[in-house]
Every structure is written in structure tokens, then in C-alpha cells.
Amino acid sequence: MENEDTGTVHLRRIDPSQNMRRFYVLAIQPTLFGGASVIRNWGRIGTSGQSKIETFDSDYDAATAAMRLQKAKRRRGYRDDGTT
């Protein structure tokens, strides 16, 4: 689910037959020097998970990378979190 104010996307993938309960969060934040960063957080639901930050020179490049990551996760079975 995308938060309109921050551009944050919360996804989850739950498959009880495989004991799989995963989350994936994507956010775009401005940097101090005029670029933008894509912040990813992922892991098992109930844990703090792992994080990765990728910095880009422009907002457009960051948004393109975030959309590419979001599409890849949706192809793998991740769906909107459903929380607000």
C-alpha cells in the first residue's frame, strides 16, 4: 500500500504452506545534496529485518528504481499490506 504523503510502499507475502511470512517496505527520501535515496527494508514479519539505502542523483532515477523493485516483488507474489 502506498502512502501518498511519503511515497512509502508496504508489501507482504504470506504462504502458510511454506511457513513464509515476509514484508518489504520501499521509501524514497531526499538527500542533503539534492538527490534522492531509495530505502528498502525487508524480512520476516515480526522482526526488524534488514535495510539497504541506494542513493541517486535525481528524484526521477530514484522513482524509476523504486518502481522497478516494486514490480519485481509483485511478480514474486508480494501484495499490498492492507494497513494504513
Predicted region positions:
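Short aromatic-glycine-(Arg/Gly/Cys) micro-motifs in beta-strand/loop hairpins
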Residues: V25-I53, M67
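A generic structural signal for ordered alpha-helices
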Residues: E4-G7, P16, R40, R44-T47, ...
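Short N-terminal "domain-start" leader segments
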Residues: M1-S37
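A short, charged, amphipathic alpha-helix used as a generic interaction element across diverse proteins
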Residues: S48, D57-R74
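Intrinsically disordered, low-complexity segments enriched in polar/charged small residues
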Residues: S17-Q18, I45, Y78-D81
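Short, charged/polar low-complexity linear motifs in solvent-exposed/disordered segments
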Residues: I53-D57, D81-T84
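Short, mixed-charge low-complexity intrinsically disordered segments
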Residues: A72-T84
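Solvent-exposed, flexible loop/coil residues
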Residues: S37, Y60, G82
